[in-house]
């Protein structure tokens, strides 16, 4: 019996398409539904953009085995970083701070403070980071982001462990 396997190029381009779809849905929720993203949502969005661009470059490049592992390792690190932000936001939604205040938006923080000072402020989150404005099947946007980034991390691990390149 002949086994069916997707090429590395097709898998990376498929990941790009999935991430582009997720980003498109996020933009739909922002512009059509009117949900404004909090700083943590924007950080997760950046992770998806970076994963999508890495997957696109990998798909167009069509690397061999070592290149596939290198691209997959970068994607894994990006998924873990984005997943960490999504996990923190999920925690804030489950256990909101007692006195939540809306903090400054991401642009203001990055434009007004050095990066070393802005990053801790972003990860502290704003009051609106703990608010659940939208849910599907009982999961918030942060929960869905965590699920998707976990699946991306599993994908990357499978690509690293894959026996064949190309």
UniProtKB/Swiss-Prot annotation:
Fetch the Pfam families from UniProt.
DsbB
Which UniProt keywords are listed?
Cell inner membrane, Cell membrane, Chaperone, Disulfide bond, Electron transport, Membrane, Oxidoreductase, Redox-active center, Transmembrane, Transmembrane helix, Transport
Q: What is this protein called?
A: Disulfide bond formation protein B
How is this protein situated with respect to the membrane? Multi-pass membrane protein
Q: Name one GO cellular component term.
A: plasma membrane
**Residues on the Cytoplasmic side?**
1-11, 64-70, 163-166
Periplasmic topological segments: 29-46, 88-143
Q: Where can this protein be found?
A: Cell inner membrane
Q: What are the transmembrane regions?
A: 12-28, 47-63, 71-87, 144-162
In this UniProt entry, which cysteines form S-S bonds?
Answer: 38-41, 102-129
In the record, the note on similarity to other proteins reads: Belongs to the DsbB family.
Q: Name one GO molecular function term.
A: protein-disulfide reductase activity
What SUPFAM superfamilies does this protein's entry cite? DsbB-like
Tell me the GO BP annotations in alphabetical order.
protein folding
Q: What's this protein's function?
A: Required for disulfide bond formation in some periplasmic proteins. Acts by oxidizing the DsbA protein.
């Amino acid at each position: 019996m002949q086994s069916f396997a997707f090429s590395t190029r097709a898998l990376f381009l498929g990941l790009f398409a999935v991430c582009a779809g997720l980003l498109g849905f996020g933009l739909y929720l922002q512009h059509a539904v009117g949900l404004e993203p909090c700083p943590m949502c924007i950080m997760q969005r950046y992770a998806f953009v970076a994963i999508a661009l890495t997957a696109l470059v990998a798909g167009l490049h069509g690397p061999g085995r070592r290149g596939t592992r290198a691209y997959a390792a970068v994607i894994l690190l990006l998924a873990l970083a984005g997943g960490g932000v999504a996990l923190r936001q999920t925690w804030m939604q489950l256990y909101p701070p007692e006195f939540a205040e809306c903090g400054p938006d991401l642009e203001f923080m990055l434009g007004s403070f050095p990066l070393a000072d802005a990053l801790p402020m972003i990860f502290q989150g704003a009051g609106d980071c703990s608010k659940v404005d939208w849910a599907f099947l009982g999961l918030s946007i942060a929960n869905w982001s965590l699920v998707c980034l976990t699946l991306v991390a599993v994908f990357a691990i499978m690509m690293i462990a894959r026996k064949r390149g190309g």
